[in-house]
Amino acid sequence: MKRNIDSFRKGLIDGIPIALGYFAVSFTLGIRGGDVGLKWYQSALMSATNYTSAGQAAALSILEEGGSYIELVISTLVINLRYLLMSAALTIKLSPKEKTGMRMLMGIGVTDEIFGISIAQKTPISPLYNIGAMSVACPGWVLGTALGGIMGEILPPVVTSSLSIALYAMFLAIIIPPARENKV
């Protein structure tokens, strides 16, 4: 029992930096949702059901261009297929004694970042570690989108358009430091 609590707590702690990063990215997606005509709560609902910036960005582009819901669903499914593979890779590192329900619960919130910290854990990993990380990271994602959507409805367009470049700035902030250290 103590091991389970410790695993969950470690997941919570390891999920905090992920939640902060998610907040920044999803904030811009919330603003972008408003730009294509969604209310803040619609953008937040999209984030609550789709924990991927690529999937949401594609969905927003399809909505903006007047695409059909079939196109939106197919695009999102194709973009998110990688999570099926990530979930399968994580189950290999689980104890064979883990119940199917825990395995499925663990797979619901797999994202690139949560997969990364989970797969780095020693074998066998605990589903509670993954669930702990999801418990803080996923609400950070949804909250960021909701607040971005609210701010997008309040702030003037000139401000929101400048905030929408934050997503690109974050990618540069992630890429540039390692690129400086690992010159090829």
What are these regions (language model features)?
Residues 1-50, 61-76:
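Helix-loop-helix hairpins and the membrane-proximal interhelical loops
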Residues 27-31, 48, 58-59, 117, ...:
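Alpha-helical transmembrane segments of multipass membrane proteins
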Residues 11, 15-19, 158, 162, ...:
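Loop-to-transmembrane-helix entry motif
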Residues 5-9, 128, 132, 168:
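Alpha-helical membrane-protein architecture signal
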Residues 176-184:
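Membrane-helix interface "capping/anchor" motifs
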Residues 73-164:
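Helix-loop-helix junctions within the multi-pass membrane cores of secondary transporters/permeases
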Residues 22, 49-55, 107-111, 140-142, ...:
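Small-residue-rich segments of transmembrane alpha-helices in multi-pass membrane proteins
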